[in-house]
Curated annotation (Swiss-Prot):
Molecular-function annotations in GO: fructose 1,6-bisphosphate 1-phosphatase activity; magnesium ion binding
Metal-binding listed as a keyword: yes
This enzyme's EC code(s): 3.1.3.11
Species for this entry: Rhodopseudomonas palustris (strain BisA53)
GO terms (BP aspect): fructose 1,6-bisphosphate metabolic process; fructose 6-phosphate metabolic process; fructose metabolic process; gluconeogenesis; reductive pentose-phosphate cycle; sucrose biosynthetic process
Similarity field: Belongs to the FBPase class 1 family.
Catalytic activity: beta-D-fructose 1,6-bisphosphate + H2O = beta-D-fructose 6-phosphate + phosphate
HAMAP family found in the cross-reference section: FBPase_class1
Gene3D superfamilies: 3.40.190.80, Fructose-1,6-Bisphosphatase, subunit A, domain 1
Segments traversing the membrane: none
Protein name from the UniProt record: Fructose-1,6-bisphosphatase class 1
UniProt lineage: Bacteria, Pseudomonadati, Pseudomonadota, Alphaproteobacteria, Hyphomicrobiales
Presence of the UniProt keyword Hydrolase in the record: yes
Length: 344
């Protein structure tokens, strides 16, 4: 793919001469440039003085900050502050960073998603969402469906950037020799029939009944209503789960549950759920809380949490049906099905 389209070529084609699109393209390019530096920093790890150790402080959501969290946050803020922006929202900051209220866009981002994986050399990433400035509406208070662009970077065996600007989903991979992202997949569509689900099964006892019912259907395999043998995945990294779904299909569930502080799940709406939902829907998939479409939700606070079920549209719709129709599970249960893994 020596002559593959570069990310900067892609954003130029997208923007044309439209002022709003030019602002969006500039923000995407800035985040991409920062991510290339971050990929180098992450890849060198301890050789670059990165230990993955806690810094003795917590971010706005209560997570313990690590040295790499802080550095990556600084790198993205530095890149975005060079551009016109109305407001910036970072997972690592308690409050918004305000710029020019008349600037055309605001950006929400998680600079280093999954930083707890650094110690084990597992996948981490960066997630971002770009929204328009709306006259009379405070930044980041509109529903997710107003997003202009969303994307995430996966720092894995390859460094890849997934992007949507509202016209499908493209995937770019970092050419390390040239220091540019090059497109490897265009107009990605999520496979619909992959029998895979991802959930942290250790929390089974805390789940709501509809989530239990869905997982039981998957575990029932060919003898259950799904009529397929499912595999369970759990990578412990939102960006890695999302990338796998885009390329392989399946469904990811991080529901709300009965633990104190987990009724709305753990993921943050503005810079995790909203951008992932936009990407999933643009790739022909779905994203729901179980009861509502994620893109219909508007944040009440910067770091508001929300449940997230995302992936192949049929599986997301099934989870929604089980939440909204309590009798759905009993209607589809085979009369003589074997007990599932979690059944008592």
């Amino acid at each position: 793919m020596e002559h593959a389209l570069t990310l900067s070529q892609h954003t130029r084609e997208y923007a044309g001469t439209d002022p709003l699109r030019l602002a969006v393209a500039a923000a995407i390019d800035a985040i991409a440039e920062a991510s290339i530096e971050m990929a180098e920093l992450i890849g060198r790890g301890a050789l670059a003085g990165i230990t993955g150790e806690a810094q003795g402080s917590s971010n706005a959501d209560g997570d313990v900050q690590k040295d790499l969290d802080v550095r990556c946050d600084e790198m993205i803020l530095e890149a975005l502050k060079k551009l016109p922006f109305a407001a910036l929202a970072s997972e690592e900051s308690e409050a918004l960073v305000y710029g020019d209220p008349m600037a055309p866009i605001s950006v929400a981002f998680d600079p280093l998603d999954g930083s707890s994986n650094i110690d084990t050399n597992a996948t981490v990433g960066t997630i971002f969402s770009i929204i328009p400035t709306i006259v009379g509406v405070a930044p980041f208070t509109a529903p997710g469906k107003v997003q202009l662009a969303a994307g995430f970077v996966v720092y894995g065996p390859q460094t890849s950037l997934v992007l949507t600007t509202g016209d499908g989903v493209d995937i770019f991979t970092l050419d390390r020799a040239a220091h540019v992202y090059k497109r490897i997949r265009h107009k990605v569509r999520i496979p619909t029939d992959t029998p895979e689900f991802a959930i942290n099964a250790s929390n089974h006892r805390h789940w709501e009944q509809p989530v239990r019912d869905f997982v039981e259907e998957c575990l029932a395999g060919t003898e259950g209503p799904r009529s397929k043998d499912f595999n369970m995945r759990w990578l412990g990294s939102l960006v890695a789960e999302a990338y796998r779904i885009l390329t392989r299909g399946g469904v990811f569930l991080y529901p709300g549950d009965g633990r104190p502080g987990y009724s709305e799940g753990r993921l943050r709406l503005l810079y995790e759920c909203h951008p992932m939902a936009f990407i999933m829907e643009q790739a022909g998939g779905g994203a729901s809380t179980g009861r509502e479409h994620v893109l219909d939700l508007a944040a009440r606070t910067i770091h508001q949490r929300a449940p997230l079920i995302m992936g192949s549209i049929d599986k997301v719709n099934r989870v929604e049906l089980l939440h909204n129709d309590p009798d759905a599970a009993s209607r589809s249960a085979p009369l003589f099905a074997r007990r599932g893994l979690f059944r008592v």
